[in-house]
């Protein structure tokens, strides 16, 4: 049995621990407590955690830019997978976005993360081949 609730900054340490224990998830300076606090404040009630018997078993962060939604860091620990947790987390995010009038959502998957790519394809998400994403880091710090 699991319980999904809104993520708060009090969950930060446990969420970072989940991410560190999950292959394919990259943590950057942008995942700092301060940056996470700003993200949660800018996108209230849109990121979620999953409570399981032993603590947190999963999480997802969700936000938008006013036009498009974005999912980041969907994580479910291996022992809790195949129970519908990831699907329920994503549905909460998409419903939250829809309440804000946002019907299209994007996410990024590292090309080396085949497990995640397989999951998203199995859920009906489409791999975009018509665009390339470019990034620029003003500070020059590639960990930002």
Describe each model-derived feature in a short phrase:
Residues 87-88, 99, 111-130, 136:
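Conserved active-site alpha-helix within GNAT-family acetyltransferase domains
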Residues 2, 6-73, 77, 90-92, ...:
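Acetyl-CoA-dependent GNAT
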């Amino acid at each position: 049995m699991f319980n999904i609730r809104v993520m708060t900054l009090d969950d930060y340490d446990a969420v970072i621990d989940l991410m560190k224990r999950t292959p394919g998830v990259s943590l950057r300076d942008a995942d700092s407590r301060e940056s996470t606090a700003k993200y949660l404040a800018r996108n209230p009630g849109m990121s979620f955690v999953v409570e399981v018997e032993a603590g947190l078993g999963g999480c997802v962060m969700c936000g938008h830019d006013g036009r498009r939604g974005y999912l980041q860091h969907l994580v479910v620990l291996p022992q809790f997978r195949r129970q519908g947790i990831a699907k329920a987390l994503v549905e909460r995010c998409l419903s939250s976005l829809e309440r804000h009038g946002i019907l299209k959502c994007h996410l990024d998957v590292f090309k080396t993360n085949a497990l995640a790519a397989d999951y998203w394809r199995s859920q009906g998400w489409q791999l975009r081949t018509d665009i390339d994403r470019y990034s620029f880091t003003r500070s020059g710090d590639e960990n930002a």
